[in-house]
């Protein structure tokens, strides 16, 4: 089974109050899992990576063998594809964690989309931020 993992993260202020959200869907659109979490004060990029790490962990837990990660973070997608280097020391640990999880899963692809194509994960992030 191939699944799509929609991830998002956001910070109000950069850094500022931050949260992430993810939605894991089966190929037919059935939601396998979704989650959002406030992570305190962080940058937008830390929030984006936190959502990716949490979503990959859930995919492993559910034994999903193949995942397409869908994100509106061009930086994160290009870093995970190896197109951009991770220059920020603050992101390096999260990048390494995401990379280890992706290798554990096996087949992971990354696709960058516009925010409008990532609405559900974005909504989860904003709900988590509004609740604080």
Residue ranges and their predicted role:
Residues 10-14, 53-131:
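RNase H catalytic domain
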